[in-house]
Amino acid sequence: MILNIITPEKVVLKEEVEEVIVPTVNGEIAILPNHVSLVTQIATGELIVKRGGKPYSIAIAGGFLEMQKNELSILANFAIRAEDIEVAKVEEAQRRAEKLMKEKTTDDDFRVAQAELIKAVLQLKVATK
């Protein structure tokens, strides 16, 4: 099946794959070639792609997926392949987010910092696998 992962910034991935394990708001689902048509909401988490019998990871946050005619299209708010993650930058982003969460901030500022922290922790998990 063909897997397309697209964010507002760029096409992250377009290739033929054997299996995709996707975090959804209802739990993880495995999608294989010729899967029934499907539309669902993606959760923040680790997306696992199997190609050539070997798995690799992508950090993904929010969005939707559509499976139709043996093509899986994922429109994500954020997605990055493990090999593209710059660990030092992500660790710095994590420290900044933790600092902002400890400071007296508005609820909106806290939620933004919390979302950044979750994204940083996810990227570190995927990058250090």
Where are these regions (language model features)?
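Absolute protein N-terminus
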Residues: 1-2, 129
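Acidic/glycine-rich phosphate/pyrophosphate-binding loops and surrounding catalytic core
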Residues: 79-129
